[in-house]
């Protein structure tokens, strides 16, 4: 009878050990997936950082060019403003008549 009890206990232990091994394999797979996603997300974040840095540099360069052009051509801006004013006056006159 002790042999039968021993074999039942061994059988129970084997089933529990197999269940634990399956859970451990599942956790290892989950851990691997998390690691893969972290690497992928890190790559995406690095690409976004590079893109934002490039965009910031482009905006800074455009801003400095705009500032230089505004300082250099005051008479051009006056002519553009005068042309717009004349356009709106003529538009309003034609709209009324």
From Swiss-Prot:
Transmembrane parts of this sequence: 75-94
GO biological process terms held by the UniProt record: endoplasmic reticulum to Golgi vesicle-mediated transport; intra-Golgi vesicle-mediated transport; intracellular protein transport; vesicle fusion; vesicle fusion with Golgi apparatus
Membrane topology label: Single-pass type IV membrane protein
InterPro entries, per database record: BET1_SNARE, T_SNARE_dom
Keyword Chloroplast: no
Keyword annotations of the record: Coiled coil, Golgi apparatus, Membrane, Protein transport, Transmembrane, Transmembrane helix, Transport
Subcellular location(s) of the protein: Golgi apparatus membrane
Every t-SNARE coiled-coil homology domain range: 7-69
Residue ranges annotated as Lumenal topological domain: 95-97
Biological role: Vesicle SNARE required for retrograde transport within the Golgi complex.
Note: Multicopy suppressor of sed5-1.
Record's subunit section: Component of a SNARE complex consisting of SED5, GOS1, YKT6 and SFT1.
Descriptive protein name: Protein transport protein SFT1
Species of origin: Saccharomyces cerevisiae (strain ATCC 204508 / S288c)
Lineage: Eukaryota, Fungi, Dikarya, Ascomycota, Saccharomycotina
């Amino acid at each position: 009878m002790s042999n039968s009890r021993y074999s039942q206990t061994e059988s129970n232990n084997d089933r529990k050990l197999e269940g634990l091994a399956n859970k451990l394999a599942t956790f290892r797979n989950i851990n691997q997936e998390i690691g893969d996603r972290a690497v992928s997300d890190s790559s995406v974040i690095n690409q976004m950082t590079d893109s934002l840095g490039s965009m910031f540099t482009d905006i800074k360069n455009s801003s400095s060019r705009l500032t230089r052009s505004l300082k250099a051509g005051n008479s051009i801006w006056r002519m553009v403003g005068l042309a717009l004013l004349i356009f709106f006056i003529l538009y309003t006159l034609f709209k009324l008549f």
